[in-house]
């Protein structure tokens, strides 16, 4: 359309067996002229504009084929975009803040008498923290809350816990492939969850472990001759892989 760009594609590999996606970017403004081509949106003569972005994939669970059993990502993306533009920027922002604050505001941490320091950037404080071998309660408190922020942002999708990369990546091939290293890193991601009053964030992890258990029964039997119980190797992925790497 005149104010929308749509990108449809799939992950690398055989398109008959890959996750497919649909991304839609839509622009709205009460003034000026909006024009969209195949790959760009141009807004002319406007002082303000709102950009709406939605993305849907065919992934529908670790036990579902992403094509033959995949989610209707095209219809879902179109439906998301259609509903999204019925909300103003302020309404969406307020809805987001309300959702986030309800979770983030449950926990407070005080370590001695941390002093808020907005004059030195965080990266400088990190370097000084390393050089001084600690001694910055403000930075320690900030990092504890930062970990909670990451968990709130990354652990909201059923069956898909926070991975080693996080929610966003600029890379086609994410570091660590965006997978799960289950010998310590996955556990570390979730250490703050219950102690800092975010038990809901563990639900995707619980679902993922259930998928590991289902697949791990076959790995235990086929690799190790174990007929009862299940196992997981040190790496897994969105498909709940349990075989040795």
Q: Model segments located where?
A:
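Aromatic-residue-lined binding/catalytic grooves and analogous aromatic/hydrophobic interfacial grooves
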Residues: 1-245
């Amino acid at each position: 359309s005149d104010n929308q760009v749509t990108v449809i594609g799939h992950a690398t590999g055989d398109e008959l067996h890959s996750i497919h996606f649909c991304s839609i970017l839509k622009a709205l403004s009460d003034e000026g002229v909006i024009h969209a081509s195949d790959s760009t949106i141009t807004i002319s003569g406007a002082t303000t504009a709102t950009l709406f972005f939605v993305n849907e994939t065919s992934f529908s669970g670790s036990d579902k084929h992403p094509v033959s059993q995949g989610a209707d990502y095209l219809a879902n993306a179109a439906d998301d975009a259609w509903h999204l533009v019925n909300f103003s920027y302020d309404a969406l922002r307020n809805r987001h803040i309300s959702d986030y604050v309800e979770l983030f505001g449950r926990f407070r941490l005080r370590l001695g008498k941390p002093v808020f320091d907005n004059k030195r950037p965080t990266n400088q404080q990190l370097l000084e923290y390393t050089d001084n071998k600690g001694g910055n309660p403000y930075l320690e408190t900030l990092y504890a809350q930062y970990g909670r922020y990451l968990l709130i942002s990354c652990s909201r999708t059923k069956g898909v816990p926070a991975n080693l990369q996080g929610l966003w990546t600029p890379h086609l091939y994410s570091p660590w492939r965006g997978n799960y290293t289950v010998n310590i890193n996955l556990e570390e991601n979730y250490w703050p969850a219950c102690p800092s009053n975010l038990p809901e964030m563990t639900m995707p992890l619980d679902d993922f472990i259930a998928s590991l258990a289902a697949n791990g029964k076959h790995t235990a039997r086929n690799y190790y001759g174990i007929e009862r119980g299940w196992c997981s190797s040190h790496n897994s992925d969105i498909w709940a892989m349990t075989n040795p790497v």
